[in-house]
């Protein structure tokens, strides 16, 4: 599947070079993204990262939508410089070059990549915190208050 992604990236770049009548440097591609994001484009490094779990579960949509979406970010940066991430320049590349609706988010099932929750307690009952917030509590970086009763959350 990763080879198909690399081939799709090359196809997209050939399409872009024909459309814009100029050459573009090919990005470094990694399959190391975790969490609920399908892909990210690192503009200054000319690098793409894809989520291998979501790729495996949604291969057709990755080829059709996610790869062009992320490449559009890199192309937008290389053509226009710094712009809004999903601004009109990016939308134009999505629509005119790739002929894809410029959606900013995917609608993949993310149950398999969902982060772990940890149960905390306050005066009014149990509250679940995501792993990132839980780790901040463990490191002593912060304490959280319940939005309802305004008491500090404690690990259950």
UniProtKB/Swiss-Prot annotation:
Gene assigned in the entry: sprT
Biological processes annotated in GO: response to stress
Transmembrane helix among keywords: no
Cofactor(s) annotated in UniProt: Zn(2+)
Record protein name field: Protein SprT
UniProt record similarity statement: Belongs to the SprT family.
Alphabetized SMART domains for the sequence: SprT
GO cellular component, one term: cytoplasm
Broad class of the protein's primary localization: cytoplasm
InterPro entries associated with the record: SprT-like_domain (IPR006640), Uncharacterised_SprT (IPR023483)
Span of domain SprT-like: 12-154
Location within or outside the cell: Cytoplasm
Manner of cofactor binding, per the entry note: Binds 1 zinc ion.
Annotated keywords: Cytoplasm, Metal-binding, Zinc
Active-site residues, Swiss-Prot/TrEMBL: 70
Species of origin: Shewanella oneidensis (strain ATCC 700550 / JCM 31522 / CIP 106686 / LMG 19005 / NCIMB 14063 / MR-1)
Coiled coil: none
GO molecular function: zinc ion binding
Binding of Zn(2+), residues: 69, 73
